[in-house]
């Protein structure tokens, strides 16, 4: 089984608690997680409960105490801004995780919440990306693929991603379609896209090229062993991408309330009931 990798500074600890909880909940053997963090945050991560192995490296020292707004106003050491430098830590993290012996790595932003087991990937898949599935005007700006949920199998791909960051139109994300083209040429059948049921973020619902009401109608109840019971067009939802703790972004809050409402319909499913109880401590009506 592949491993997981994530970045986590002080702002990500609350999200990590959800990520760890849901990885444990839906996977019989929770995967090893490789984490880039910083000295003040590492003890907080170590204190979080997780039955799998956590491998943490102090690699984010240049960004201690800084949020995105500040980093975007600060010149970077390699890229235009310090935030661009921070985003480029993702391919460096993947390179390091693969150096530790991981058999492929799935990068997850800390704010991924799983609703079922991790996706299965064939051994020939070298790169798997999650399309935003948003309207073209937003795709043109932010990129075809989301950089918060992606799989790669080799250091060569991680190095190519880092190289492409230098000319990306949107941080580490806008160049992912170029990475997909490169991988497709190098490995026949080596590139795969995750389906709509994976990495479903508020942006897929509110920024889609179809009305959000129509997209919501695709969601339904479909009880299946080992899954939460939420489905899109008869396929179980694997994960959503959201900050459950957020209080100052209406789009995210509306998405969270809607998802939690759907999950509450499924408390007859034991694991889903556990998830609802966990999330209800976080999300306030």
What are the language-model segments listed below?
Residues 82-83:
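Extracytoplasmic beta-rich repeat domains
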Residues 11-12, 40-41, 61-62, 112-114, ...:
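Short, solvent-exposed loop/turn segments at secondary-structure junctions
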Residues 16, 91, 172-176:
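Conserved glycosyltransferase catalytic-site signature
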Residues 155-255:
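Catalytic core and acceptor-binding pocket of nucleotide-sugar-dependent glycosyltransferases
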Residues 1-76, 99-101, 259, 267-285:
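N-terminal anchoring/stem segment of glycosyltransferases
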Residues 16-17, 21, 63-70, 136-145, ...:
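Short, charged, surface-exposed secondary-structure boundary motifs
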Residues 86-140, 144, 151, 155:
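GT-A fold catalytic core of metal-dependent nucleotide-sugar glycosyltransferases
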Residues 108, 145-148, 172, 236:
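Residues that flank catalytic or metal-binding motifs in active/ligand-binding sites
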């Amino acid at each position: 089984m592949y491993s997981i990798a994530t970045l986590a500074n002080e702002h990500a600890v609350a999200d990590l608690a959800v990520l760890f909880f849901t990885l444990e909940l839906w996977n019989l053997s929770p995967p090893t997680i490789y984490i880039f963090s910083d000295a003040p945050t590492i003890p907080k991560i170590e204190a979080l409960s997780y039955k799998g192995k956590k491998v943490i490296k102090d690699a984010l020292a240049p960004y201690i105490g800084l949020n995105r707004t500040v980093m975007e106003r600060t010149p970077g050491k390699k890229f235009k801004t310090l935030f661009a430098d921070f985003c480029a830590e993702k391919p460096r993290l993947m390179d390091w995780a693969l150096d530790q012996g991981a058999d492929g790595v799935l990068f997850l932003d800390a704010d991924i919440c799983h609703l079922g087991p991790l996706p299965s990937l064939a051994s020939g898949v070298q790169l798997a990306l999650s399309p935003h599935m948003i309207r073209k005007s937003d795709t043109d700006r932010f990129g075809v693929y989301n950089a918060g949920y992606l799989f790669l199998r080799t250091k060569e791909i991680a190095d190519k991603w880092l190289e492409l960051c230098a000319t990306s139109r949107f941080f580490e994300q806008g160049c992912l379609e170029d990475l997909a083209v490169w991988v497709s040429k190098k490995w026949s059948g080596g590139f795969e896209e995750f389906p709509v049921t994976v990495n479903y973020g508020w942006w897929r619902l509110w920024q889609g090229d179809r009305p959000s009401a129509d997209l919501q109608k695709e969601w339904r109840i479909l009880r299946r062993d080992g899954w939460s019971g939420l489905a899109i067009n008869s396929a179980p939802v694997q994960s959503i991408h959201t900050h459950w703790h957020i209080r100052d972004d209406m789009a995210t809050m509306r998405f969270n309330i809607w998802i939690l409402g759907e999950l509450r319909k499924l408390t007859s499913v034991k694991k889903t009931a556990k998830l609802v109880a966990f999330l209800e401590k976080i999300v306030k009506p």
